[in-house]
Structures are given as structure tokens and as C-alpha cells.
């Protein structure tokens, strides 16, 4: 949604003293200018916003006739780009205790630590997001600036009731994780302005009992397989890295358009110590020389990289400890701790799609290109590791890429089924589950 926002004009509310806004959000871009998730406006003196500020704190604001009726900001920050947050704003101005009139929940838990608070007076009915003829926007400020960069899902609004979190999610009895409820049933009713959009896809058609559809204001609304119930890895914007973060885009799955003359490394989110993981890297561009390494793609042991990297970045030191494996564009595969590496892997060029299958149960990494596994590799071979590169040690391993020049441009596909904005077609056959990939293991 980096340039995308949605619009709607509200109708006459069922009850403007009570409402609930619930949504799931996964951030892509962090620690930059204020980014609006929700905006409402009657005029310059009657406004509403729910946004992350430049320091990644969450704030809510409502003004009536130029005076704040709601204003608060969290002390906590929201910088986990691997996570889906369920954020719920519940308003009931009929409550006698002012702190009960506005409640904010994150993943089912009420927020109570705020840098400042302004609560509405009792029975205040000037709530702009649920006011007749308010111009509503999801994903941007009213003038299409301060656009939100990330993913949203299950955006629900209940008019007339301040709901509890259990309407929208529940705690997993085994893991303790807050998980989504894919069937939302308000305790009373949706109310006149109630809606439910972005349910299991990019549809702007209201899937509540109403017909309060939304309209695409600008940009392209892309469906992702990454969702609150099935999270996929991305490049880790929150990690220590020398990558120019401004060049990252498309949900942190694209890295390019940089111009330094030094190595820039970025690890993935969702590092693991066990299990089997598959992902793809498309080489969108390579620096002109065919005799010099300017790209390395593979895996990094996140804990070891942090412990051993004195520059506070993820650029792997290839002459020291063994905490990374990189497939170089001209000279084969290198295990950190070995400068020479292994040359019996093919080179790669622009337009190639690299395949990575990481088997952490057997400490094997399989490398492939354009649908064929290198060294006749067989990712299903288990402990025998047919054609695999041996992962040197157990650890917390994640996908990893390094590039050197501005023309070294790459895209990852960890299951969303896109390289940048281009959908994969045809997808691997049979269809990959979960996720959509160019090739099938």
C-alpha cells in the first residue's frame, strides 16, 4: 500500500457515541514520517486520525470545532516488520469513567501506557470517523500524503457498540498467540456505518451485513498470501544493515536502485533453527562486469552474525567465522571462513530466478536456478543431502542477500507469488502450499 489508499463517505450513524474499529496490519516501512492508517474529515476543524508517528508510536486524534476530544499516543513502539498486529479502537463516550470511554487494544491486550491522554466528555457525540458525510480514507492523510506502507487485512468497523477484542480474535490455548477470527459477528449488530473489507484478499466490497463498499483512491491494491493466519518472510528492515532502506519496496521484498561501491547485506525475517524452508530470488539486474562478484545470495546465522560483526551490520565477513553461505554471481558458493569457496556452481545473470531449499533438520542447503537444482540436488533426500551444500553449524538461519552496486537489483519471493508487482505465471505445478512460487520443489 506504499502509494495506495482507499476512500468512502460515511452515512448517518446508528449511534455516534459508540463504535469499534478493528484491523490487522503488518508494517513494511518504519521510523520515517507519520504514516496514516485511517483518516476522517468533515473540515479542517473536525478531523480524525489513527497513525504511526515518525518514532513508530501509535496515536489517535479526534477534534471537534478545533478542540481535541480524543488525543493519545503510546509509549511503546511498533517496529516488528515480521509481525501482524491486531489493533482495536473501542469508543463509548457514555461511560462514567473517562478512561473507559476510549480503549486501545493490541493483540487482545489493552494498552495502558501513554505519553499523553485526552478523553472525550461524557456522552460526546462528535466522533468524526462515525459522523454523517465524513470523508474517510484508509492508508493516507486526507490530501494523499503520509501514505501507509505495509499490509492490511480484516478491516472491520462496528457502528453503535464498543466491542471487546474477543469479537475479532482469540488466544491460542497452546501457544498463547493472539490469532485472527475469520468469522466476525458483532455482539449487537454492524450498525448503519459498519463494514468489513480486505477479508481474505483485496476486495473492497463490504462483507458485513451492509453494503458500505470502499473505493480505490489511488495506486494498486495487491492481494498477498501473507496474512494474519499465514505469515511469510521478507527482508528485515528492522535489522542492523548497511542497505539504503529507502531503496526497499514492495513489502520489503525488493532491494535496488542503490549507488554505493561496497557490499550491502540484508537478512530475512522469521529466522529458524529447525524445519524446511523454500524461497526464490529474482535477479532484476547485475552490474555490467561478468568477471567480478557483485551479488551473493544464501543464508546467514542471525545470532552469530550479530555477535561477530563489529560494524553493526549484516555484511558477512567471509574470511572469519562460519556464519553464512553465499552463492556468488561469478565464482560459485562461499562459506564464510573460506575465501575460495566452491566453484562447481553455475553463474547467474539478470532475469535468472534462484531457488533455495533450506533443510535445517539435516543442516543442508540446496541451490537451484530457473527450475533446475545445482549438482543434481534433491531437497527430499533428507540426511543423505544429495547435491546439497552442508550448513556448517546449528543456529538461527534466515535468507540473506548482499549486493554491491546500484545496478545490482533483486526481488525475493517467499510465497506471495510476486516479483515486485508482477504476478508469477504460471506458478509451480502442482500449486505450492502454502504460498505461490515460480518453481515447485
Regions found by a protein language model. Give the residues of each.
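Short surface loop/edge beta-strand patches of beta-sandwich-type extracellular domains
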Residues: 1-19, 69-79, 141-144, 180-188, ...
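Glycine-aromatic-enriched beta-strand/loop faces of beta-sandwich-type recognition domains
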Residues: 296-353
